[in-house]
Amino acid sequence: NTVIVSKEIPRPTPQEISEIKRSNYTSGDQMLLGLACNIQYGANPELQRILHKTFVDVMLAESQKEGENLNRLTNRAVYLLCWMRRYLPKLFINWKSPEIGCFIYLGGCRNENEALFMSFLGRLPLDVLILCPDLNIKCCLEDKLLYEVNYPESLAITEYPEESSQVKIGTAAYHAERELDTL
């Protein structure tokens, strides 16, 4: 199961945000436990346990950052839950361990919310591939679990090529052969 996102991860819609159950919180721990109740995968208890633990771990790490206030942390958690509801059903349809899906993101994380979501996905039984072909656009994600490969060449690609007709690549030998065919 593969999900491909190009350019940016669309922000949660007001409707998606309103579907997240929340209340007034007085502490970060209370907020995390309250919001974690939104993670429901009843058909697969193992997956629900993994998602719940990963959500709490990632948000606890986020709460340790200097200067994080409760409202900002709550907003980040709500964004994370909205994106989970949007993408995880596609990634984990009929999931059984040790199967893994793949989340491909072309363009790189542009803000802290996207970076948090990618960090969250990277801790799930998923492959996460973040492609940043344009060296002028920097990815703001920094994660100790991230395996990073950088190349000196830059390529201005805005959309992930989903159809083979969009990709036109040939070797020098191939092009020389085609040129000889026209003579």
PLM feature segments, named:
Residues 62-150:
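Active-site and donor-binding regions of nucleotide-sugar-utilizing enzymes
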